[in-house]
Design a protein with these regions (language model features):
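Helical anchoring/docking segments at protein termini
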Residues: 1-47, 199-232
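Amphipathic alpha-helical repeat scaffolds of TPR domains
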Residues: 11-24, 45-72, 94-111, 129-151, ...
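Helix-turn-helix repeat elements of alpha-solenoid scaffolds
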Residues: 27-41, 72-85, 109-115, 163-167
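Tetratricopeptide repeat
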Residues: 35, 121, 170-173
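Short, composition-biased local secondary-structure segments
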Residues: 84-92
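Canonical positions in the second alpha-helix
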Residues: 90-91, 120-124
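A short acidic, amphipathic alpha-helical/loop segment
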Residues: 116-121, 135
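Long, ordered, amphipathic alpha-helical scaffolds
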Residues: 150-232
């Protein structure tokens, strides 16, 4: 995907928002202090718009975020806190059946309740909510990674029941992914963690130390086993 500033600055509709255009232009040039002054002026202006105008801006901006990389260059704290969060929260209250504000809040904004927003987007939008679906799966895969990232030191940081349930939920979500290659990649990752969990359960029934050696002797093909084994 293309850098977000490149996508925004070449967009025809940017001229509708001259102060936001100035912010992006200055940001692209690396003039952070000056860019934030323009952003502050833009936020003050946008707060005066009616809800419809604010929602139109949000639709335009988040659509660009969905097809861009490095969105942190534009989605800076003042823009999120002072404009986008309040805007989306009002939108959810005024039109609770629209999945878009839930999707954007869960995918892009800083919140402890990301999963709840994404589940709401899926509930309302169904299979059309592919970005919400993929984001949820990524969150689950990151949680599984955390559970196992010290496993070579005989340290499992997860809960067996919780991770078993997480794997099942993730497979259910992945069955709704439309892109076949993405679904295949996710399945491979989920199979990896499922095998690892199964082996850890089997290992702990036999012993408490030496999981790497146990995997080596069992012929398990985890990428970290041989590397760790040879280093020793």
């Amino acid at each position: 995907m293309v850098n977000v500033l490149t996508n925004i600055l070449k967009n025809d509709r940017l001229d509708v928002y001259p102060l936001f255009k100035k912010f992006c232009s200055l940001k692209e040039k690396g003039l952070r202090k000056e860019s934030f002054k323009s952003l502050s002026s833009f936020i003050d202006e946008a707060k005066m718009w009616d809800d419809n105008a604010q929602q139109n801006f949000a639709c335009w901006l988040f659509a660009l975020f969905e097809t861009s990389d490095d969105i942190h260059h534009v989605l800076v704290h003042p823009l999120e806190k002072e404009l986008l969060k309040p805007l989306l929260e009002r939108w959810m209250k005024s039109n609770p059946e629209d999945p878009r504000p839930y999707r954007w809040y869960g995918v892009f904004l800083n919140t402890e309740n990301r999963v709840d927003y994404l589940h709401n987007a899926l509930r309302l939008g169904g299979s059309k909510e592919q970005l919400s679906l993929l984001t949820l799966i990524d969150i689950n895969l990151n949680a599984l990674w955390y559970s196992f990232h010290h496993i070579s030191e005989d340290l499992y940081l997860g809960d067996i029941k919780e991770d078993t349930a997480l794997l099942a939920k993730s497979r259910e979500l992945n069955n709704k992914v439309e892109c076949q290659q993405t679904r295949k990649n996710n399945n491979e990752a989920l199979n990896y963690y499922q095998d690892l969990l199964n082996d850890w359960v089997m290992f702990t029934k036999e012993q408490s130390k030496g999981f790497v050696e146990w995997c080596e002797h069992k012929g398990r093909n985890y990428y970290w086993v041989k590397a760790y084994y040879y280093e020793k």
